[in-house]
Amino acid sequence: MRKFTAFACGTGAGLLTFYLTKLNEPKAAVHNSWTRSEKPVDPCALWDHNWDLRDPKSLVKPVKNDLSQEQNRYNSELEKVVPKHARHIILIRHGEYLDVGDTDETHHLTERGREQAKYTGKRLCELGIKWDKVIASTMVRAQETADIILNEIDYEKAKVKNCAFLREGAPIPPQPPVGHWKPEASQFFRDGARIEAAFRRYFYRAYPDQTKDSYTLLVGHGNVIRYFVCRALQFPPEAWLRISINHASITWLTISPSGNVSIKYLGDTGFMPVNHLTNRIPRAAKNVV
């Protein structure tokens, strides 16, 4: 009986000690692994409010002293440079085309590519947008796509601007690299500067004298559009090749008066029949001479 009592007491004391030890252990905080909420925000993830060098505070001389006159001067000048309306930039990728011959002049839309462009034009018409500007890449497939779209929307063809900066190219070496597409470093050097210049030409917040929201239609190319999306949203531009957009798709970016940028559509082709959804050159017509 004594042995049993001693065993029971020993076991109870052991369990009590174990319980008290566990009770006093510090509790580890549980975090959702994907949020990284226990770490400070990486500097590269912070939004650059002056990305276009048009932040109103950067355009006005700062306050020099605490005098009310100086503060009034600052507020008055600041009010004059504050945008009041948004800029909507709608990007259209060209339709499916034939990679025939060695020059751009022979790279015409396929019949399906022409139909894709018509569907896109009809969709843009349905959206009821009042266009302020229509600008097209000077490459044949973009010109043909723009011409078909213009038959469907309310915009005079004579007012269309052509821009060589929007031509297709290699914007920046992608991450991760891919084995099937490796342009020379010289091509990235040449095309990258041009495509970045195109971004700076068309992406900026509204000027203070803009009296209403504006709508700009850009007809261009897959690589250029994907690079623009990354740059506008301040994602790493090297990520552009991780995005895939269909032929004649609609991508819609909005630059608010504050300079914040949001995306409404990314490569939208939901308005097309499924047999018209393509994103690559037809294999049977690739590099045909």
From Swiss-Prot:
* SMART domains (alphabetical): PGAM
Q: How does it sit in the membrane?
A: Single-pass membrane protein
Q: Which CDD domains match?
A: HP_PGM_like (cd07067)
| Class of this enzyme | hydrolase
Task: Report TM segments.
Answer: 7-23
Q: Quote a single Gene Ontology cellular component term.
A: mitochondrial outer membrane
Swiss-Prot/TrEMBL GO biological process terms: positive regulation of mitochondrial fission; protein dephosphorylation
Q: Which reaction does it catalyse?
A: O-phospho-L-seryl-[protein] + H2O = L-seryl-[protein] + phosphate; O-phospho-L-threonyl-[protein] + H2O = L-threonyl-[protein] + phosphate
UniProt GO MF annotations: phosphoprotein phosphatase activity; protein serine/threonine phosphatase activity
Disulfide links within the chain: none
Q: Give the location in the cell.
A: Mitochondrion outer membrane
EC number(s) from the headed UniProt entry: 3.1.3.16
Which key words tag this protein in UniProt?
Answer: Hydrolase, Membrane, Mitochondrion, Mitochondrion outer membrane, Transmembrane, Transmembrane helix
What PANTHER family is this protein classified in? Answer: PHOSPHOGLYCERATE MUTASE-RELATED, SERINE_THREONINE-PROTEIN PHOSPHATASE PGAM5, MITOCHONDRIAL
Under the subunit heading, UniProt states: Interacts with Pk92B/ASK1.
Q: What does this protein do?
A: Displays phosphatase activity for serine/threonine residues, and dephosphorylates and activates Pk92B kinase. Has apparently no phosphoglycerate mutase activity.
| Homology family | Belongs to the phosphoglycerate mutase family. BPG-dependent PGAM subfamily.
Q: What is this protein called?
A: Serine/threonine-protein phosphatase Pgam5, mitochondrial
